[in-house]
Amino acid sequence: MKKIFLALIAAAFTLASCDMDKSPEGSTTDTDALNSVEKCKSFRNGLYTYMRSVTTGGFIILSEIQLDDFHAVRGNSNRLMDFYNGNILATTSEVASIYGGYYSVIAGTNFLINGVEERIETGFYPQDSRHELNRYLGEAYFIRAFSYSNLADKFCGSYKHAEDLDKEGLGLSLQTTYAPTGDNTTYPGRSSLRATYNLILSDIGKADSLLSLYEENY
């Protein structure tokens, strides 16, 4: 009897270990998140959720507080006075949130753009799905351009001389591939203003072409 009991315990652990090797039912991983047009649509919808987070709250208000239209009064309780007084540092938590927020959106667009384009090249999707995929790609390119444009507006100075355009370090860190890592040294340093705006204009051009193709066949 004891041997039978031990055998049942061993079998239970074996079954449990097998279940642990499986992904939870209904879950999606990086490798299969774009494995159908419907999944691409779901991921694209998620990009608009990210967009809502970077087009409200501090992403909008903090810039307005620095303008002449805002007047601090006693009832303000000293909130956001660092921005009102121009005492803004790289360590200011609101600054880090804005910077990280836009790059989170960019990471999502890179995942969609890289993944869908790679699958299109290998003929992974049905031929008749290209029309719909053009829409998702076009929107992703526009959202990436929008994010980089807002980052440039907030974290890059305006150039005063033509030679400033090509100076390294005056632009943004430009990441166009999805390669998340905890090692910050693997990410590119700040580029030039020319490279930054060239990428923004290139993404806008691709978005326009892809969305025009979609609308022509709508």
Locate predicted features.
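Short alpha-helical hairpin
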Residues: D68-A90, L174
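Conserved, well-structured interaction surfaces
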Residues: L80-C156, Y187, S191-R194, K206-E216
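Short, surface-exposed recognition loops and adjoining beta-strand edges that mediate ligand/DNA contacts
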Residues: L34, I60-D69, Q127-D128, F155-L172, ...
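Membrane-proximal, proline-rich intrinsically disordered regions
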Residues: C18-L67
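Sec-dependent bacterial lipoprotein signal peptides
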Residues: M1-A16
